[in-house]
Amino acid sequence: MTVSDSPAQRQTPPQTPGGTAPRARTAAFFDLDKTIIAKSSTLAFSKPFFAQGLLNRRAVLKSSYAQFIFLLSGADHDQMDRMRTHLTNMCAGWDVAQVRSIVNETLHDIVTPLVFAEAADLIAAHKLCGRDVVVVSASGEEIVGPIARALGATHAMATRMIVEDGKYTGEVAFYCYGEGKAQAIRELAASEGYPLEHCYAYSDSITDLPMLEAVGHASVVNPDRGLRKEASVRGWPVLSFSRPVSLRDRIPAPSAAAIATTAAVGISALAAGAVTYALLRRFAFQP
């Protein structure tokens, strides 16, 4: 699922001096829930879905409880399977166009205040290095796509539901979870030409171990117990994100075209270089 195909957002590196071949494009893959945002993206929309008549009060309470458990202890494979069953059963018969409309209308009120400032900074740093940014989530594509666009991501990979006559059947076409995430990443890398050994990945959950293993540079964010143990054994960096902020309060990361233009102006280039250097030092990765 491509979020944007514009040249500025694709971040293709320029031709290197001397006419040599350009450096291969690389990517940074981000889990969404509890890595970029502080809650479950799907469960966060339970209130607007209720307000528009898609959920009853009992379903809202059940979703709130699931959110509490998710935040309290993270979600293991069994919990994720139960959550998947609950959510697919809940949305059977929903009108897809209505869901998309609700998400688009309420996105900035519901989700963008939950974005970790540290995650937004890290995404900006990767973009300044010329990398594509890919959001990878087990949540539905109707939710993940708009969030990814708001973050300035290049691609989004998410769970796809089966749709008939414009309504969800309650069955899943592709579950973007566990090994499914890793397979989706490998397929995108093959399509886009990403050398995965030079790519980055970030997640909070042990269930995303296959995704982290698929790249050359893995880091864990606010990890659950299982993933923290794996990170210790493998020597993966452990990042702590704790400051949710509104994207409306942040200045968007400059595009590649903007960077190239301002680079010709000494003072602008110096400022951009200082920002880039500070971000790279903060998150300890190579340009």
Curated annotation (Swiss-Prot):
Membrane topology: Single-pass membrane protein
Subcellular location: Cell membrane
Gene Ontology terms: cellular component: cytosol; plasma membrane
SUPFAM superfamilies linked to this entry: HAD-like
Region (Disordered): 1-23
Membrane-spanning residues: 258-280
Pfam families reported for this sequence: HAD (PF12710)
Main enzyme class: hydrolase
This protein's record includes keyword tRNA processing: no
Biased composition (Low complexity): 7-23
Gene Ontology molecular function: any one: hydrolase activity
Cofactors demanded by this protein: Mg(2+)
Keyword vocabulary terms for this entry: Cell membrane, Hydrolase, Magnesium, Membrane, Metal-binding, Transmembrane, Transmembrane helix
Active site, per annotation: 31 (nucleophile), 33 (proton donor)
EC numbers on record: 3.1.3.-
Binding of Mg(2+), residues: 31, 33, 204
Entry's family note: Belongs to the HAD-like hydrolase superfamily. SerB family.
Full protein name: Probable phosphatase Rv3661
